[in-house]
Amino acid sequence: MASKPEKRVASSVFITLAPLRRDVAMAEEVRQAVCEARRGRPWEAPAPMKTPEAGLEGRPSPWTPPGRAAATVPAAPMQLSNGGCPPPPPVLDGEDALPDLDLFPPPPPPPPVLLPSEEEAPAPMGASLIADLEQLHLSPPLPPPPPQAPAERPSVQPSPLRPMEEELPPPPAERVEKGASTDICAFCHKTVSPRELAVEAMKRQYHAQCFTCRTCRRQLAGQSFYQKDGRPLCEPCYQDTLERCGKCGEVVRDHIIRALGQAFHPSCFTCVTCARCIGDESFALGSQNEVYCLDDFYRKFAPVCSICENPIIPRDGKDAFKIECMGRSFHENCYRCEDCRILLSVEPTDQGCYPLNNRLFCKPCHVKRSAAGCC
C-alpha cells in the first residue's frame, strides 16, 4: 500500500481508495516495512465471491454509446480486506453531465463484489497485515487483552465482639526484684529493702534498727517518741531538753510563761502580795525582782500627791505623770499657784513655779508676796 492515496481513472469517475484502518496501533518502523513490501508486488484483487446475483452474468448489459464507458453499479459496495468501504461514486444525472474524454481507452469493468455467504466465515481482520509481518520475520502484534471483569473485593465481615476481658491483654505481672527499692533510710542513707523491716515516721523512711533515740540510742520502733528539731527522742530524753520552772524547779511540759529570762508554770507566776495569777497581764517588779500586779504595786510603791494626798497612778487607761518640786510629788492637775490657782509650767519660764516659804506661787503672786513681806 502506497503512503499516498492511489487514484484510478474510470471514464470520468475518480475513485479514491482510503488507507486501511488498523484496530491496533503499530510502530512507525513496522508501518514503513509493510509499505515497502507491498510496493514490490502487484495489487491483489479480492477473490470473487458467490452471490445470488451470479446468474445475471450471462445477460447482455445495456447498450452504451461508443467512446464512453458504461458505469457499472455493483450490487453491494466493495469491501476492503480490513473491513472498510470506499466512498460511493458520484451519481450522474445525464449523458451530457461530463464531457467526452477520448484521452484514454475505457478500462475494463471492475469485477463484481459479492457479499459473503453465511456459510463462509469472513476473513479475520488484518489477515494481510499478519502475512506481511510473517514474510518480514516480525512477530505479529499482540491482540488486545480481553476486558477483565472488575475484581471483586473480598467481603469483610465484622468479627463478633468479644467480652472486655478477652480484648484487653492481661496486665504484666510486677516482678519484685530482691533488694530493688526506691526508699532510702533517712539515718544511714542506704536503700531500704522490701524484705527488711521499715518504719515510716516524720514523712521519712527508716530501717527498724536505725530508728532510735538520738540521745540514748534506744529503739523507738513501736514506741512513743517526741520530735525536736527534726530528731526523734524518747520521753526521758525529751523531758531533759525541756525548761524548768524558775520558781518550783520542775520541768514545764504543758503551758509555759516566759518572763525575766526564765520559764514558769502558769500557776507559779503570781503576785507576791495578793497571790493572783498574772498570766498574760502586765506586771511590775520590786527592788528584789518581786512580781507584783499593778494594783498592789501602785498601792505600795506609787508616790502620793502632796496636795490631794492620793497616789499618782494611771487611771482610765491613761498614763499618770508625776511632777516633783521641793522634794514633793504632785499630779499635773494639782501643780498650781496657791493664790490665783493657775496651772504652773514645768519649764523655767515666767509661767513656771516661783516657790516662796515652801509654797507654790506664780511669778506675779511671788512678787506681791515678796513686796508685802509676808507669806
UniProtKB/Swiss-Prot annotation:
Q: Where in the cell is it found?
A: Cell junction, Focal adhesion; Cytoplasm, Cytoskeleton, Stress fiber
Keywords, A to Z, come to: Cell adhesion, Cell junction, Cell shape, Cytoplasm, Cytoskeleton, LIM domain, Metal-binding, Repeat, Zinc
Output the Gene Ontology cellular-component terms: cytoplasm; focal adhesion; stress fiber
Q: Region annotation FERMT2-binding: residue ranges?
A: 278-375
Residue ranges annotated as compositionally biased, kind Low complexity, are 150-159
The UniProt entry, under Gene3D superfamilies, shows: Cysteine Rich Protein (2.10.110.10)
Bias (Pro residues): 104-114, 140-149
**Which region ranges are annotated with the description Filamin-binding?**
1-70
Return the annotated region ranges for Disordered: 43-119, 137-176
> What are the LIM zinc-binding domain coordinates in residue numbering?
183-244, 245-302, 303-372
Q: Explain the purpose of this protein.
A: Serves as an anchoring site for cell-ECM adhesion proteins and filamin-containing actin filaments. Is implicated in cell shape modulation (spreading) and motility. May participate in the regulation of filamin-mediated cross-linking and stabilization of actin filaments. May also regulate the assembly of filamin-containing signaling complexes that control actin assembly. Promotes dissociation of FLNA from ITGB3 and ITGB7. Promotes activation of integrins and regulates integrin-mediated cell-cell adhesion.
Cross-referenced PANTHER family, in alphabetical order? Answer: FILAMIN-BINDING LIM PROTEIN 1, ZYX102 PROTEIN
Protein name, UniProt field: Filamin-binding LIM protein 1
**What species does this protein belong to?**
Pongo abelii
